[in-house]
């Protein structure tokens, strides 16, 4: 494991925190495999890890409350290790590398509570001594919060768009 981490550091492109995460992921994986095989994990043991063993590890992680997203990240670490290990030890790791990551869905952003939005707008009013700047900033925040505009949509409003009608028709990305 240390040789793999040293190799990762040598090729660069990864932060120290990423390397630490990889180390933790692999240590937990190897600990599971040691318990799973009821033996110390050796290079020969790793060469014999099969799809069923990988699925057992993934099921164990999920049963301990690990989210699908976190499991996918850990699986990526383990696959990275096995890619390096298979090349170093000259064996075929296709079965392990073919394990699919669990599906996960991006969470929708949570809306700001009304009280928090009012506080934000009140704070913005106090941040600038120029009335027109405060009015502009409050207007933009109101459009973002109350009308659901994206920042780019609010910033693309032109003077010719004023005064805004009572009903606002927003054409966002791809004129949707």
Located regions from the model:
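Conserved catalytic core of the tyrosine transesterase superfamily
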Residues: 1-176
């Amino acid at each position: 494991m240390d040789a793999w981490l040293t190799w990762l550091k040598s090729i660069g492109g990864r932060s120290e925190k990423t390397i630490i995460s990889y180390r933790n992921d692999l240590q937990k994986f190897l600990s599971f495999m040691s318990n799973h095989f009821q033996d110390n994990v050796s290079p020969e043991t790793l060469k014999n890890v099969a799809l069923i063993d990988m699925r057992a590890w993934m099921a164990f992680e999920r049963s301990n409350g690990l989210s699908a997203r976190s499991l996918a990240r850990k699986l990526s670490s383990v696959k990275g290790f096995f890619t390096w290990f298979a090349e170093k030890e000259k064996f075929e790791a296709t079965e392990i590398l073919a394990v699919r990551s669990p599906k996960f869905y991006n969470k929708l952003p949570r809306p700001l509570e009304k009280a928090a939005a009012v506080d934000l707008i009140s704070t913005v009013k106090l941040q600038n001594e120029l009335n027109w700047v405060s009015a502009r900033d409050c207007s933009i925040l109101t459009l973002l919060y109350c009308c659901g505009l994206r920042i780019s949509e609010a910033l693309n409003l032109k003077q010719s768009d004023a005064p805004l009608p009572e009903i606002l028709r927003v054409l966002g990305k791809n004129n949707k």
